[in-house]
Amino acid sequence: EGAYSHLAVQEFFPGAEPLPCKTFEIALNEAEIGNVDYAMIPIENSAAGRVADIHRLIPKSNLHINFEHFQKVEHKLLIHPDSKIENIKNIISHEQALAQCSDKIQKLDLDILIGADTAGSAKKIQDEKIIDTAAIASSLAGKIYGLKVIDDNFANSVNNITRFYIMSKNENLEFDETKTYISSFLFSVKNTPGSLLSLIHISEPTRRIH
């Protein structure tokens, strides 16, 4: 609770009740068996690149990609409400968030602790009343776990976006001519030189239609 996936659900499905899952595989399975209407899965990040394992899991699922959502990632530096910046010796978060905030971490000369995720790192500080460690997480996580924001823009870059797929068992969505649609292709090629290039050439248009 309080992760960037939670924020993405709030923005794309206002009023919906999110069901947190420990793994992407569990999230996809929950949608497959009908326990939830949609699985909202991060695919790639503008700073960190492709999210590990997702492209391996999608072909194994029986879900369809219905929508996509681009979530702005704004890393906050959070501390326990009883702490001060001069008390901070360590910093904890998910390894990708730590990498995306490396410039300021280096300036503060903090020891790095790897957390399972951003929201869980924030929760740990509150639950264990840790005053010598800061967490990198979202503003939502700070609000949920009652932490104090000491840096509102802690990331190396302000242009940090995560792309999500919204997937479900429904493949027959109503067409809306006022919206723009895209197609996603998932394929594999032989492990030989030029295989990918050959496929790209096949997909190129042979003539321009006016």
Regions found by a protein language model. Name each.
Residues 8, 14-22, 29, 33, ...:
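Regulatory modules associated with amino-acid/nitrogen control
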Residues 3-6:
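Short N-terminal binding/cap micro-motifs at the start of the first secondary-structure element
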Residues 200-210:
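Single conserved hydrophobic/aromatic residue that forms the stacking wall/gate
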